[in-house]
Regions:
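Hydrophobic transmembrane alpha-helices
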Residues: 1-71
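Intrinsically disordered, low-complexity non-transmembrane regions of multi-pass membrane transporters
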Residues: 1, 118-137, 240-259
Length: 259
């Protein structure tokens, strides 16, 4: 599949908007489960976009940024990985193995960009001391423009100039290597879940985890059915723990002379 200039620009604009949302809006538009289908719509393959976005969401679900420890960049990883899956026709698991190296490289660039921007803070301090609100606004808008432009270029350049070579590269690579990428991509969602469980797991959650494992591994229930049952359990637990409304105490009556 060939990607037109218009499609590459549209994907770059999508990365621009998602990059600003990740650090400023936080409407969760930057998550793979949202970006994947949007990439699929732009490239005309919504089905693959949904599958790849869902697979990548499992990978990044447990990768939360903690201070200076930043996970691979979720936006470029999703856009490049989903585009790779659509243009080459590989399975989403293989696309995960391709997306993560791009995501790691871009996150290093983001860290460098933020380090450069930190040099402007001393100037912002002087503006704040002089009550120069317009100057601070200009600095903020400039930073947003620089961040969005970086995301645009990181999405546009590899997609527009590299998409036509991606299919050729896949055809040349040995089948064992492709299978290895698929295995690595299949392991990464499990790693994401493991990291998420390490963060939120408590002893009281272990029985629910066992129930979900039995339902999925032994009873072969679909994920949607397990999610609906988990939602019902969560609602039951919430309603049981919610305090009942207390009745107002009846006013005490005072009696005089024994009446």
């Amino acid at each position: 599949m060939e990607i037109s200039l218009f499609q590459a620009i549209a994907l770059g604009i999508l990365a621009f908007i998602a990059g600003l949302d990740m650090f400023n809006g936080l409407t969760h538009m930057h998550r793979p489960v949202v970006l994947g289908p949007l990439v699929g719509l732009i490239l005309g393959d919504l089905h693959t976009g949904i599958l790849t976005g869902g697979t990548l969401e499992l990978v990044w679900m447990g990768l939360a940024p903690l201070a200076g420890a930043q996970p691979p960049n979720v936006i470029i990883g999703t856009i490049v990985g989903t585009t790779f899956a659509i243009t080459t026709g590989v399975k989403p698991d293989v696309a995960v193995g391709v997306a993560v190296p791009f995501a790691v490289a871009v996150q290093m660039g983001i860290t460098f960009l933020f380090s450069v921007m930190s040099g402007v803070m001393s100037r912002c301090d002087r503006m704040a001391a002089n009550a120069d609100t317009r100057g601070i606004e200009r600095v903020n808008y400039l930073a947003l423009l620089a961040l969005g432009t970086f995301y645009f270029l990181c999405a546009f350049l590899p997609i527009y100039f590299g998409a036509e070579h991606a299919k050729t590269a896949i055809d040349v690579l040995p089948e064992r290597l492709i299978d290895g990428l698929g295995v690595a991509g299949g392991i990464m969602p499990a790693i994401g879940f493991a990291v998420l469980l390490k963060i939120m797991m408590k002893n009281v959650y272990i029985p629910y985890f066992i129930i979900g494992f039995v339902a999925g591994a032994w009873l072969k229930l679909p994920v949607l059915a397990i999610a609906a049952a988990a939602l019902a359990m969560a609602l039951i637990d919430l309603l049981r723990k919610s305090p009942e409304p207390t009745q107002p105490a009846a006013p005490k009556e005072e009696f005089e002379d024994g009446i």
